[in-house]
């Protein structure tokens, strides 16, 4: 009883004393540690803790949520952001919202509705469509600075290009200067002179050939003119025949007159030149009185005169023929042939 009771009596007292001693210590440090964390996070949460996205992104979300045809007002955007993100600092929110709207307009993410004259963080805003978002940034960027820079760059390279174009002109001038040198080389060549002489000779031949052709060409109109001349020639021939026939008639008439005067000359003027038998008889009779002397000679004398009376029948006919009117169109050859035939018959 003594050892166990003693121990049991001591233990509660020790425990009570320990609990009483620990309880105030544990309570003291507890509040001290518990009081530090609430004060600690309150001071450290402002600089370290950022529990909302950038203001521009919140503005875009607000416009997407309350999308309207005429756009969303700035007051509606503020209410949406404060309701969704209560941790935003209200004091700085007005300034941050104004900056976010300006950056959105500059980047082409936001746009004002038509016929809106508001400026800054007033009025209403709209989202730009996606296809316009891609086009507008390109238009805005080149429209302001890049295009001017491009123009400046374009003007810059043009000057070297012009400088490059000048050397080709110099080269052209050099080529032009070289061409006269090429022209100076041909004169010493004999082949060129011979070729020129041949060309000149060929040109002269061509001119001669052309002149020969020109000379040959005129006879063609002569051939054309020959037709009327041939017709005139026929008339001339007919006239010549007529003149010849008239001349022949005149000659025959003269011959007949000569024959009528004397028989001898008529016989000598015969064309064929053959003596007729009547002529022989007349010559024989003329010789006969010459052979005999006396009165026979006187009788022979009248025979001479009678020789003119005794004329062949064909001769008498011939003398009568030209006196009468000759028929037109009868050829002379026919009359001459008739005379020759009559002589042959005699």
UniProtKB/Swiss-Prot annotation:
Tissue: Oocyte-specific.
Region (Disordered): 1-50, 121-346
Keyword DNA-binding: yes
Biased segments, Basic and acidic residues type: 148-167, 205-225, 251-262
Basic residues: compositionally biased ranges: 128-137, 172-182, 278-288
Cellular localisation: Cytoplasm; Nucleus; Chromosome
Biased composition (Low complexity): 1-23, 38-48, 298-309
Listed GO CC annotations: cytoplasm; extracellular exosome; nucleosome; nucleus
Sequence motif Nuclear localization signal, residues: 164-179
Keywords: Chromosome, Cytoplasm, DNA-binding, Meiosis, Nucleus
Domain H15 intervals: 51-129
Composition skew (Polar residues), residue ranges: 334-346
GO MF terms held by the record: double-stranded DNA binding; nucleosomal DNA binding; structural constituent of chromatin
A Gene Ontology biological process term: epigenetic regulation of gene expression
The keyword NAD belongs to this UniProt entry's keyword annotation: no
Family under the similarity heading: Belongs to the histone H1/H5 family.
Functional summary from the UniProt entry: May play a key role in the control of gene expression during oogenesis and early embryogenesis, presumably through the perturbation of chromatin structure. Essential for meiotic maturation of germinal vesicle-stage oocytes. The somatic type linker histone H1c is rapidly replaced by H1oo in a donor nucleus transplanted into an oocyte. The greater mobility of H1oo as compared to H1c may contribute to this rapid replacement and increased instability of the embryonic chromatin structure. The rapid replacement of H1c with H1oo may play an important role in nuclear remodeling.
Protein name per Swiss-Prot or TrEMBL: Histone H1.8
UniProt source species: Homo sapiens
Gene from which this protein is expressed: H1-8
């Amino acid at each position: 009883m003594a050892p166990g009771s003693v121990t049991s009596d001591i233990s509660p007292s020790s425990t009570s004393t320990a609990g009483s001693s620990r309880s105030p210590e544990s309570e003291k440090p507890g509040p001290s540690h518990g009081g530090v964390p609430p004060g600690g996070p309150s001071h450290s949460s402002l600089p370290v803790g950022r529990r909302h996205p950038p203001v521009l992104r919140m503005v875009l979300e607000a416009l997407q949520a309350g999308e309207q045809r005429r756009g969303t007002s700035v007051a509606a955007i503020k209410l949406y952001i404060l309701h969704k993100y209560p941790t935003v600092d209200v004091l700085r929110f007005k300034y941050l919202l104004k900056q976010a709207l300006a950056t959105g307009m500059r980047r082409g993410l936001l746009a004002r509705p038509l016929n809106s004259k508001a400026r800054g963080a007033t009025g209403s805003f709209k989202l730009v469509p996606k296809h316009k978002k891609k086009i507008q940034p390109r238009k805005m960027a080149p429209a302001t600075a890049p295009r001017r820079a491009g123009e400046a760059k374009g003007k810059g390279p043009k000057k070297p290009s012009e400088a490059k174009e000048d050397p080709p002109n110099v080269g052209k001038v050099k080529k032009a200067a070289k061409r006269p040198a090429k022209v100076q080389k041909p004169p010493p060549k004999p082949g060129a002179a011979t070729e020129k002489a041949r060309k000149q000779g060929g040109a002269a031949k061509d001119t001669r050939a052309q002149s020969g052709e020109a000379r040959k060409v005129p006879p063609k109109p002569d051939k054309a003119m020959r037709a009327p001349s041939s017709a005139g020639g026929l008339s001339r021939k007919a006239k010549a025949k007529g003149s010849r026939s008239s001349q022949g008639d005149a000659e025959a008439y003269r011959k007949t007159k000569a024959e009528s005067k004397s028989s001898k000359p008529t016989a000598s003027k015969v064309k064929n030149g053959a003596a007729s038998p009547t002529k022989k008889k007349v010559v024989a009779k003329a010789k006969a009185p010459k052979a005999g002397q006396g009165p026979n000679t006187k009788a022979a004398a009248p025979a001479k005169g009678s020789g003119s009376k005794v004329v062949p029948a064909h001769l008498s006919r011939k003398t009568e023929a030209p006196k009468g009117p000759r028929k037109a169109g009868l050829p002379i050859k026919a009359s001459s042939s008739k005379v020759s035939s009559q002589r042959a018959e005699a």
